[in-house]
């Protein structure tokens, strides 16, 4: 059997993955808070850990892997959105969940085995909080229930590599007066009449964010499971607090044995933000005509533990590559299994960049069947994602010859105005202009519009 190695954030080492039960490999991924469209950064862990799901299914069997990814549908951000819009909370969350599934489906992500909504697991959350209180790991104060960090100093901070004392010393937030320790965090909080709430032993209220994932993963996967994944921005406090809650409520269990965290995403070398004007939702890109398969390809070109930079150039190059690969694999059956080199790359801590490099080798060798099998393993080249590439291609040879002749003439006359005019027009039409001593190549980008070339005729 293939040996999978994963970088475990908890031990800070690459370890051989050994499942608790090879006949039921289990993974949990923290999902979105559903109040708005998923942005490009939200999509990265979905795509990355979709590849992990596919790899585990490849190695252990399609029916032997359980994947849970939650929806946080009770949160103050959702409450704020409802108040601002005048819409019902349930209407907003249901709509946003549907958006999320459609957008991630467009990126080729398989649906998880379980997609629990936090609001469906309130009784389990209350039961876990009661267990924590009974074990002296939590206390009630002014309608709130808080986790007592001092009750588990030996374990708290191991994932993020912080000590409780250092965290307290570095805290810059105002501490609620009812907390015994500044690092204590909320398990349950009271709800006003106009806020979502559920009856509990501590009055009407709602759960804190961290207890939601602990309760859902415990109910679906048990007190010990294999892999927990998420963005590295969740390592502290969310994942640290999950570990504390779960291990203290179920001391006989291990909770998650392997922790995987993906790095963050940038756009054109800068942090994505609305103030910089480089903030994109997945739907924004899809509506711009960038195929979901192209977005996925760009994601997979960077190892999940490295920062990823989304650029228009990468998207254009990805589209050109996928067009060539789809032409090579059209009308043929995939090989019986993906090439060993591709599987080995993925098995080495999800080295998707290495897998893509191996796929380039298969394409260069003309091995369409092998390329197709590898593509299906990483979620590329499937029929369901190929409609964009089936659009009739445009013969650009006349335009390439025209620009080449214009450049040759300009070299003689030193007047490059016509060359510049043509280049600007081709760029405006969504073509990437590649010029060399031997010729000109026009490569359609994601936003290519053939109609804009008519003005040059």
Swiss-Prot record:
ATP binds at residue 274. Coiled coil: none annotated. The keyword Cell wall biogenesis/degradation does not apply. A motif ('KMSKS' region) lies at residues 271-275. Its main location: cytoplasm. It is found in: Cytoplasm. It comes from the Bacteria. Keywords: Aminoacyl-tRNA synthetase, ATP-binding, Cytoplasm, Ligase, Metal-binding, Nucleotide-binding, Protein biosynthesis, Zinc. It catalyses: tRNA(Cys) + L-cysteine + ATP = L-cysteinyl-tRNA(Cys) + AMP + diphosphate. A motif ('HIGH' region) lies at residues 32-42. It is an enzyme of class 6 (ligase). GO terms for cellular component: cytosol. GO terms for molecular function: ATP binding; cysteine-tRNA ligase activity; zinc ion binding. Zn(2+) binds at residues 30, 213, 238, 242. Its EC number is 6.1.1.16. Transmembrane segments: none annotated. Monomer. NCBIfam families: cysS (TIGR00435). Belongs to the class-I aminoacyl-tRNA synthetase family. This is Cysteine--tRNA ligase. It comes from Ruegeria sp. (strain TM1040) (Silicibacter sp.). The gene is cysS.
